[in-house]
Amino acid sequence: MILHIFNPEHDIALSYDNKYFTPPHAGRQLRYDLDYLPALWAKDGDCIIVGNTTSAMVHARRFMAHVQRVRFISQDEVANVADEIELVSPWGWDSAIKFQLMKLGIHEDVLPSDAELSEIRTLSNRRFSAHVLQQLQQDMQLPFLCGEAFYVESIPALKDVIQSFGKAIIKAPWSSSGRGVRYIDQAMDAAITSWAARVISQQGGIMVEPYYNKIKDFGMEFFVDVAGVHYAGLSVFHTINGAYVGNSLSTEDEKRQMLAPYVDNRVLDRLTEHLTQLLNDHLKGKYQGPLGVDMMVVANQNTAADTPSGFFVHPVVEINLRRTMGHVALSLSKEERFQQRMMRVDYDGAHYHLHTIHKEQRF
């Protein structure tokens, strides 16, 4: 039996790297409100840790017909099923979630070792994404692939790179969606300089990359097992100011059609092939579980460059070494009644809600 738990505060926990980490209120609320999500991909007989089993059942029934095949359990019930657990599947692995699970009575032999968690944290640093981006561009040698990112360890070095870019984006090496990111227009002001200095002090450095005129967000989802990395499907998603808003729920062919005006299907095939191999080279034997690679279509800002569609593709904006909302969308898209709809996460001022809406409705 697999035990599932939704810990969306994972990205922030990685930045703190402290088993006693307490997430901010928003993270705790998101975890409580959407803790039923693993029911969408859990197998028959699996258990899911939730805050309120009755509420979880009600919410899960909105999205799946056979929710009774999985079992929602409270934290108090975990110790009762500990001997049945063969595998634990969180949203993402970090030292805090391991500590929480051990306190609930999960046997240590079904949890990753501290060394494995350290490796996962290292690979979750945005430096790894930048390294894979560089390798992918070198391997594919396509003129319409773009993207560069640099890791710097001081404010003077950061200012030098920003000066060469003009408009730039700086990112904390470990941070969650929409957080830990600042946009720079020509030069850093005092507030951003102070923020960047804190990031460098706490995390050892900071990422800096040029600002791109983004046209469309998309990504690729993968799963890693003992055999290696396997492609799971495309993700066409939507963000506002860098924060996730929602996903298109469609078949793989339909998502390819959405991207066709910007990215030729043959390019997608080559990207998938090369990226799968690169990820396999880096991750096999070091990580098992889901992951996602965020990408984007970029406007052609270089009129001298000839691109088949008139657009560029940034193939590795970041690598999320965890489950993503793209994986959630893939699970929902298997239900025919949700296809041609949009998956959306809303906050009403008190609670988070997962909805599916008609594509005609705006985010």
Identify what each model region corresponds to.
Residues M1-D44:
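N-terminal-proximal low-complexity accessory segments that begin disordered
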Residues R28-L37, I49-A157:
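Conserved N-proximal alpha/beta basic substrate-recognition cap immediately N-terminal to
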Residues D44-D46, V50, Q340-F363:
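C-terminal amphipathic "assembly/sorting" segment characterized by alternating charged
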Residues L133, I162-Y183, G204-K214, V293, ...:
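ATP-grasp fold ATP-binding core
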Residues E148-A149, A168-I192, G219, N241-L259:
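Glycine-rich phosphate-binding loop of ATP-grasp-fold ATP-dependent ligases
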Residues G166, I192-V245, M296-N300, D306-V316:
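Phosphate-binding site of ATP-dependent enzymes
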Residues F222-Q277, N320-D346:
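ATP-dependent carboxylate/phosphate-activation module, predominantly the ATP-grasp catalytic core
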Residues Y231, Y244-F311, A350-R362:
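A long amphipathic alpha-helix within ATP-dependent nucleotide-binding catalytic cores
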